[in-house]
Amino acid sequence: MKRYILFLIASFVAISVSAQRITHDFRDVSMSKALKMIEANTSKYKINFIYNELEDFTVTTSIDKKTVPDAIRDVIGFYPIRMTVDGDNIFVECIQKENTKLIGEVIDKRGQPIVYANISLLSAKDSTFINGGVSNLAGKFVIPCSAKHALVKVSCIGYKTILRAFDAGDIGKIIMTEDMQVIKGVIVKGHRPIFKHEENKIIFDINQMQKIENLTSKDVLKFAPGVIINSNGEIKMAGKKATVFVNGRQLSDEEQSAFMTNLKASEISKIELSQNHG
């Protein structure tokens, strides 16, 4: 049986590479500090950003011999932050200009970080979607939010979904409990990580899921970190419309709708999620 690879990307500006390489382990440092550290290790680029705009976003990632643009891509991750390049200047800005943010940390009962959990902010009045984000390698998340109060939905494969009301600001730690039974009876095998970070993308290993025979690709995508599927079927990632590739070929909107409905989950070998392509 032919198997497919789905590749989703959020819009991003193509960047030329530099001979300079960055190697560093970032452990729970602010985005502002991470960018300053990268800038200190390059003589080619000046990195421009508004300090207070990015200070609340925290970075936990390891960078090994990356170009300056690629290093910045890694520290940005799936935050709603955009990078553009103009000659020797790199501009980094948050694309969601809200005065308040929802800040927190997702952990298990042993205190270990839960990586790539989906966090959705819903209206406290009617549960409509406001904004969303993904926990990073330290289990932490920062989501710009215009609402002072919101319902916070936290979900991750293998854990019980949490739905609680919070005020905007730092809500502290959210503890999730394990639950091998997930939507529609799908079971996670648990032998290998179902999500894996490679270069500038997240690999969603469909082979680590059982009982998916009756699911479509659309059903499985609902498990993917940072992916939101609107009621009209539009796929968004990191707050932006996602471009969908199947085995390297970009799908039109019409093809995308057909694939999401007709392509069975069992026909997919893996899903790749990225904020850039090429």
Protein language model features and the residues they cover:
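N-terminal export/assembly leaders
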Residues: 15-97, 127-131, 192-198, 232-243
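Short acidic/polar hinge/loop motifs at secondary-structure boundaries
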Residues: 142-144, 249-278
